[in-house]
Amino acid sequence: KQIAFVSNRDGGKATKIYVMDTSGNNLRPLTNDAKLIWITSPNWSPDGKQIVFVSWVIGKGAKGNGKSSGIFIINRDGKNIREITKDSKLTSVESPSWSADGKQIVFAASAAVGKNGNEIYVIDINGKNLRQLTKDANDNHHPVWSPSGRQIIFSSRRTGNYEICVMDINGANIRNLTNHPAPDYQPSYFVPSLLSVSPVENFKLTNWAEIK
């Protein structure tokens, strides 16, 4: 078993993905591309062979500032890194989650610079067949695929407050699972084979990790 996490432990401003054994041994950087300046949300594929993540990239930039965010996939040995959202104009990309069969990624993003509210999208891992599931500009975030592969849970402000919602994988049958004055967000399905770790007190060094 191994843990993937994000850190800037080398002293630079950019973050990298690191992998280590669950014992803490065999620590090594997985990403080392100077164009990837801020990496977040590493997520193991169901078969443990790949990791999807979000990164800000030095380049043309959707915001005209020389930087843009995208979704990347990398092999667990650090090879074959590729951006699967490079052909889209989406911004504020976040929270990628694998489908149960490992063939698709669900994520949240904004369709245009300055547009209020993220929407939920799904894309094949080869970067093809991008489709939008929510179309309501209600600030939808943190999508997670169900282990059955039939539903997606996410947080949404469609009722004026962040609640946990669920929908079918085609975007139909959206309904609230929570209804509370306090905001509810960042849902997660419990999968016995996978454990997420987020030590907030060490945010500057390790802000997200996952055991596989």
At which residue positions do the language-model features occur?
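Sequence signature of WD/YWTD-type beta-propeller architectures
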Residues: 1-212
